[in-house]
Amino acid sequence: MASVPTQRDEKEKKNDELATAILKDKKRPNRLIIDQSDNDDNSMVMLSQAKMDELGLFRGDSVILKGKKRRETVSIVLNADNCPNDKIKMNKVVRNNLRSRLGDVVSISSAQLEYGKRVHVLPIDDTIEGLTGNLFDVFLRPYFTDAYRPVHKGDIFTVQAAMRTVEFKVVETDPAPACIVAPDTVIHYEGDPIKREEEEEALNEVGYDDLGGVRKQLAQIKEMVELPLRHPQLFKAIGVKPPRGILLFGPPGTGKTLIARAVANETGAFFFLINGPEIMSKMSGESESNLRKAFAECEKNSPAILFIDEIDAIAPKREKAHGEVEKRIVSQLLTLMDGLKTRAHVVVIAATNRPNSIDGALRRFGRFDREIDIGIPDAVGRLEILRIHTKNMKLGEDVDLEQVANECHGFVGADLASLCSEAAIQQIREKMELIDLEDDTIDAEVLNSLAVTMENFRFAMGKSSPSALREAVVETPNTTWSDIGGLQNVKRELQELVQYPVEHPEKYLKFGMQPSRGVLFYGPPGCGKTLLAKAIANECQANFISIKGPELLTMWFGESEANVRDVFDKARAAAPCVLFFDELDSIAKARGGSVGDAGGAADRVINQVLTEMDGMNAKKNVFIIGATNRPDIIDPAVLRPGRLDQLIYIPLPDEASRLQIFKASLRKTPLSADLDLNFLAKNTVGFSGADLTEICQRACKLAIRESIEREIRQEKERQDRSARGEELMEDELADPVPEITRAHFEEAMKFARRSVTDNDIRKYEMFAQTLQQSRGFGNNFKFPGEAPSAGQPVGGNGGSGGNDDDDLYN
């Protein structure tokens, strides 16, 4: 039966919609979608006749167009029969002036423009290289004569004449900001040409379109910033003061600074940037003075946004600040934030990745009113970011950005930008044989053949890792199931534990249950516990953090627990993530029995581990795998359901598993046809996986030794023969030891030894049997009456999912 949405679900959905309501485009008749124009004239836009009638426009009217980033331009409107009602046709020049693309939405309204007295235009430098003759006579006069073209300050227009295309920029108009160039308008063109770089910089200003994966946060910021700056009367009408400050916090690379720049560009507000450390000065009182000047500048140019980057550098907690300067700066910032005139139209945005190190007084209401967490994006957010970064890239047909987004767990915006860059560089490397560094130019054919492929992205993903985990030893291992011989039941159990929640989350949602997130491997040393953890992390494409128990312990009080917290925080940031505790018994010993433990550090560490495993913090997709060969000394609280609830015994391999281990170890090794691996497996009873691998390594070493000795002998014989002038035989040039033979294994078996004694095995068996008995009902529990026919119970025991005997070594 499908689950019925509850009243609570409906309420949550409504709240979500309200939270992002500000982002929804309001439908208005004058908002139209941009389409490609058939007309190449820079001053013309086309509408359907019906739309012109609806908006009260006539053919030849001047209109003002508003695009992205508060950009405006003016044009003449014409009717076109082939233009749909909801579209507006314009050429590339007009689109660039509006900072818009095909498919974007622009608004159009009638404009009452005056004839201009003066217009000042300047050419772009790279379009007039090598030009001789008068620019005015050749280009500008024919372009403007009798055309009555409307122009807007800041616009760029192109003029074609004398087999050349020249770009001009409108620097100034009188009256400003737009006018019509009439026959008596004076056109000035004196001055240095405008540099292309400066123009490109202006074109590449960031806007809301360049932000991905922060939809909800962007809605909050627009509420807090755009509403007070654009419509302060809203707050006045409802009787509250508009917010003054926003604190953006989150890991490095999530886009905090980018958001602030985009808001400034889109609102058209004055933007003043303070980089935290820059205002510090060695002169007494100068640092505070710099802050005061910044606030005064913003108030003078309101509406304004004051952005303080890395605020933790200038506003640390006063009780922890070492110098007097920091304390004075914090006090100055507090008074300035309070002293901002209520309707001064100045919003302060601050960014930090260490919100807890900022002075508490700054974080109260009335200073930084709202704290917005710019977190690590999910798969949908990552796809948005990838689309933004690849919009100007040439991509091959096989590139599946959705798949790339799904596999880049834990990546922030900066990591994804680096990934795209690395993939593009790899594509260039592949074409390197066609490129000569000494040449001044590169063939157009080579340039056209460049396209980033999925293979390039795969290569880049192999090299990149989430920045949140750079300092932790995080690797996606390259161990696969084929590297592990035997243990089929254990593999299945692990797949259900880790792969299912990552790959089929909807199934858990359907049955309304949280997946189990912890597993403990126990068993004799050398049976593949660590190898299994690596394989599962690789198979489900999760990040993998390996923690060696003793590494967490330090001599400083409280530092060991902080290390545990940091590790779990990093794992949560890079979810889905497998946290692997090797030698768990070193940090999870039963509490209260630590003899000679200074200050009870080991007990505090285990307490921290327990709260992190099953604490108040939502674990997200963090899976904990512990491995130990001393399960008897581990604290029972760690092994309860909800923490490490799946206890899996990794026994010594049976005969079939030993054969699999031999095959896995020797799968890349040339073997002679008469080598009987079945016989080897039959005669290595009681050997662990590590012991069997060691036998293979020793046989390989013996083969290498024999090969080198024979080569030296043959080389000597060859030299003797050539000295006597005799010819070399064909067979003497062949490889002396082409494969590993029975003799090598017979020799290796002389040195083979068991690393696990019968006594050790008995201990593990007893522990496993104790667990079996503590399971209570075993296979005897049944409901009264007939069992439902929907399916038989799977796997009687909870350990390895097979028969009871599978749990133990026979």
From Swiss-Prot:
Source domain of life: Eukaryota
Catalytic activity: ATP + H2O = ADP + phosphate + H(+)
PROSITE patterns the record matches: AAA
EC numbers, comma separated: 3.6.4.6
Cell location: Cytoplasm
Location of region: Interaction with ufd-2: 805-810
Outcome (variant: K256A): Loss of catalytic activity without affecting oligomerization
GO MF, one annotated term: polyubiquitin modification-dependent protein binding
Keywords: ATP-binding, Chaperone, Cytoplasm, Hydrolase, Nucleotide-binding, Repeat
Pfam families assigned: AAA, AAA_lid_3, CDC48_2, CDC48_N, Vps4_C
Gly residues biased stretches: 793-802
Regulation: The first ATP-binding region has low ATPase activity. The second ATP-binding region is responsible for ATPase activity. ATP binding to the first ATP-binding region induces intrinsic activity of the second ATP-binding region. While ATP binding to the first ATP-binding region appears to prevent ATP hydrolysis by the second ATP-binding region, ADP-binding to first region promotes the coordinate and cooperative ATPase cycle of the second ATP-binding region.
InterPro entries: AAA+_ATPase (IPR003593), AAA_ATPase_CDC48 (IPR005938), AAA_ATPase_domain (IPR050168), AAA_lid_3 (IPR041569), Asp_de-COase-like_dom_sf (IPR009010), ATPase_AAA_core (IPR003959), ATPase_AAA_CS (IPR003960), Cdc48_dom2 (IPR004201)
Cellular component GO terms, alphabetical: cytosol; nucleus; VCP-NPL4-UFD1 AAA ATPase complex
Induction record: Induced upon ER stress. Repressed by starvation and oxidative stress.
Biased composition (Basic and acidic residues): 713-727
Binding site for ATP 1: P252, G253, T254, G255, K256, T257, L258, N353, H389
Tissue: Expressed in body wall muscles.
Listed GO biological process terms: autophagosome maturation; embryo development ending in birth or egg hatching; ERAD pathway; IRE1-mediated unfolded protein response; mitotic spindle disassembly; negative regulation of protein localization to centrosome; proteasome-mediated ubiquitin-dependent protein catabolic process; protein localization to nucleus
Changes seen on gene knockout: RNAi-mediated knockdown causes embryonic lethality in 30-50 percent of embryos. RNAi-mediated knockdown prevents ubxn-2 nuclear localization in the 2-cell embryo. RNAi-mediated knockdown in an unc-45 (m94) mutant background, does not restore motility. Simultaneous RNAi-mediated knockdown of cdc-48.1 causes embryonic lethality. Defects in oocyte meiosis I progression. Defects in embryo S phase DNA replication causing delays in cell cycle progression. At the end of mitosis, impairs chromatin decondensation and nuclear envelope re-assembly.
Subunit-structure text: Homohexamer; oligomerization is ATP-independent. Forms a ring-shaped particle of 18.3 nm diameter, that displays 6-fold radial symmetry. Interacts with cdc-48.1 and thus may form heterohexamers. Forms a complex composed of ubxn-3, cdc-48.1 and/or cdc-48.2 and substrate cdt-1. Interacts (via N-terminus) with ubxn-3. Interacts (via N-terminus) with atx-3 (via RRDR motif). Interacts (via N-terminus) with ubxn-5. Interacts with ufd-1. Interacts (via DDDLYN motif) with ufd-2. Interacts (via N-terminus) with ubxn-1. Interacts (via N-terminus) with ubxn-2. Interacts (via N-terminus) with ubxn-4.
Assigned protein family: Belongs to the AAA ATPase family. CDC48 subfamily.
Designated name of the protein: Transitional endoplasmic reticulum ATPase homolog 2
Species in which this protein is naturally found: Caenorhabditis elegans
